Amino acid sequence: MKIDVIPLGTASAVPTDERHLSALAVERKGQVLLFDCGEGTQYRLREAGLSWARIEAIFVTHLHGDHCYGLPGLLSTMELQQRADPVTLVLPPGGPAMLRAVPGATPARLSFPVHVVEADAAGTLGTVYETDEIAVEARRLDHREVFAMGFRVAERTRPGRFDPERARALGVPEGPAFGRLQNGCPVTTPDGTTVRPGQVLGPPRPGVVAAYVTDTRPCAGGRALAEEADLLYHDATFADDHAARADETGHSTARQAATVAREAGATRLLLGHLSARYPDPAPQEREARSVFPAAEVAEELRRYELDPREKEPDPVGPADES
């Protein structure tokens, strides 16, 4: 199932005429995961054609205002619009306390179910959200003394494609037996022969991976999240001319983001969290492409489509006999 990654806000610290405060949506099967929620995110969701009612989970990287001050308002809107479906909030240490300080946004007082996951201050992270089809992993980043985390959305590997012709050749009757094989269960043919899934299924099909790594120096956590990602959104606050400033403030340059993408084996790189000091981000894009050609400045409201069919292995026959 394809995934759309939609940058809603790609500015650093303050909005500009062209860029808005940090937020990024991942849409799959009409359901939305929201990463960061700076001021104005509700407007950006509307402009992107994304309904707040379809948000299943919200992930906040850290408690700097440009990444989280839109969250109380979004929760209040959900309350006012009589939301009934549950929502999961994955927050850094202190996140729940911040919401409790805002009337109308305290999770325990909202009329819809809210599941709060507060990251361990010691940085013990891992899988913070999962369904039958996807998992979201969090890792600690390096944003000076501020606790910050990045996220990796990964579809689960799916069984290989079912070969009905081979199943018939092995004596499997059409009907429920086909379904059992596709679900990974062996079946017995009318003549008593056991047919196993590996005899009629192609190689396993990997799902797509998107990583959100922002407000960080280059670090081990960010590289791990970016490992073989189909799409990596990475902090590129500064160009090379302010590399020292990037290190001082706990950010990355565009070239450093590209180096992370290259070393991690990512497929595509989106440069985000861009400083307002660069009205034209073309120099940052050029610097990144000199290291990693598949880099580009993130375009707000554009849908970056990730299709798992593009990753499917060639149908070279049954994967095994088990």
From Swiss-Prot:
Cofactors required: Zn(2+)
Region ranges (Disordered): 300-322
Keywords noted in UniProt: Endonuclease, Hydrolase, Metal-binding, Nuclease, tRNA processing, Zinc
E.C. numbers: 3.1.26.11
SUPFAM superfamilies: Metallo-hydrolase/oxidoreductase (SSF56281)
Known catalytic reactions: Endonucleolytic cleavage of RNA, removing extra 3' nucleotides from tRNA precursor, generating 3' termini of tRNAs. A 3'-hydroxy group is left at the tRNA terminus and a 5'-phosphoryl group is left at the trailer molecule
Compositional bias annotation for Basic and acidic residues: 300-314
One GO molecular-function entry: zinc ion binding
Pfam families: Lactamase_B, Lactamase_B_2
Co-factor: note: Binds 2 Zn(2+) ions.
Residue positions binding Zn(2+) 1: 62, 64, 143, 215
Catalytic residue positions: 66 (proton acceptor)
Binding, Zn(2+) 2: 66-67, 215, 273
Matches recorded under InterPro entries: Metallo-B-lactamas (IPR001279), RibonucZ/Hydroxyglut_hydro (IPR036866), RNase_Z/BN (IPR013471)
Keyword presence, Transferase: no
Role summary: Zinc phosphodiesterase, which displays some tRNA 3'-processing endonuclease activity. Probably involved in tRNA maturation, by removing a 3'-trailer from precursor tRNA.
Subunit structure, as described in the record: Homodimer.
Family that this chain belongs to: Belongs to the RNase Z family.
Protein name: Ribonuclease Z
Species assigned in the record: Salinibacter ruber (strain DSM 13855 / M31)
Lineage, broadest ranks: Bacteria, Pseudomonadati, Rhodothermota, Rhodothermia, Rhodothermales
Gene: rnz
